[in-house]
């Protein structure tokens, strides 16, 4: 089953963002490599696996400044700290 994007700007043929295309390639490769293995809760697993490097790289980009990192991510600093603690990154 193919999923057709419902957002008008995507369906009219505008180019995909490089990040979106890269994520799509990785997800396709992951699904292909499953080779029939059962996976449950793929959505949450993918979000979890993407969130950790996202937090680490943004924090590195902001030279450890959590306020700047939170602003760049568009989340409150307390939320960032909670996530860092949750993943054992602090």
Curated annotation (Swiss-Prot):
It comes from the Bacteria. Residues 66-85 bind DNA. InterPro entries: Fis_DNA-bd, Homeodomain-like_sf, HTH_Fis, Trans_regulatory_Fis. SUPFAM superfamilies: Homeodomain-like. Transmembrane segments: none annotated. The keyword DNA-binding applies. GO terms for biological process: regulation of DNA-templated transcription. Keywords: DNA-binding. GO terms for molecular function: sequence-specific DNA binding. NCBIfam families: PRK00430.1 (NF001659). Belongs to the transcriptional regulatory Fis family. This is Putative Fis-like DNA-binding protein. The lineage of its organism: Bacteria, Pseudomonadati, Pseudomonadota, Gammaproteobacteria, Lysobacterales.
């Amino acid at each position: 089953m193919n999923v057709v994007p419902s957002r008008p700007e995507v369906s009219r043929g505008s180019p995909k963002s490089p990040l979106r295309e890269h994520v799509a390639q990785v997800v396709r490769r992951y699904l292909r490599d499953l080779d029939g293995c059962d996976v449950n809760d793929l959505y949450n697993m993918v979000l979890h696996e993407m969130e950790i490097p996202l937090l680490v790289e943004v924090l590195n980009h902001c030279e450890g400044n959590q306020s700047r990192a939170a602003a760049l991510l568009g989340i409150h600093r307390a939320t960032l700290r909670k996530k860092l603690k949750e993943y054992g990154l602090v």
